[in-house]
Amino acid sequence: MFILRLFSPAFGEIEADESQIFSFPEGLPGFSHLKKFLLIRHRDNSPFFFLIAIDEPEIYFILIEPSRLLADYHVELSCEQQGLLHLSEETPVLSLNIVRIPPEAKEMIINLKAPVVFNLQEKIARQIILDADYPVRYPIPLSKVKEKADAGTK
């Protein structure tokens, strides 16, 4: 197992092992040139993660586990999408959603239409556009997020 060390302007010196590195064969929309990302959890039991571009660590995304906030949100992948991610019934999967927190905002915006799905076994991931009628911009009050995050640490 190798250890990756990189410096990110937002996070400082980061040390991570290879289990936290994911390949994005097509990159992310708008960042197709970036193929390798580091996925780190904000802190234990936090619903937040950071997805940091290895080749350009100044580029990162904030992601969240939507199930921690929205009980009725479910990611259903088509057979084609499952194939692109090399998924089977037994494959461990993590589905996260990109969030945007505008400066001085009282709410954050979650993209529910296009989750980032991680194949935890093969270490590949893709942002998938769901067929379901979920919004691209779903607002959630930051107070609700803080309440749920605090509940997860107890």
From Swiss-Prot:
Q: Which Pfam families match?
A: FliW
Write the record's keywords in alphabetical order, separated by commas.
Bacterial flagellum biogenesis, Chaperone, Cytoplasm, Translation regulation
Looking up Gene3D superfamilies in the UniProt record yields: BH3618-like (2.30.290.10)
By its UniProt entry, which InterPro entries does this protein fall under? Flagellar_assembly_factor_FliW, Flagellar_assmbl_FliW_dom_sf
Domain of life of the source: Bacteria
**Where is this chain's protein located in or outside the cell?**
Cytoplasm
Q: Name one GO cellular component term.
A: cytoplasm
Outline what the protein does.
Acts as an anti-CsrA protein, binds CsrA and prevents it from repressing translation of its target genes, one of which is flagellin. Binds to flagellin and participates in the assembly of the flagellum.
PANTHER family according to UniProt = FLAGELLAR ASSEMBLY FACTOR FLIW (PTHR39190:SF1)
What is the protein named? Flagellar assembly factor FliW
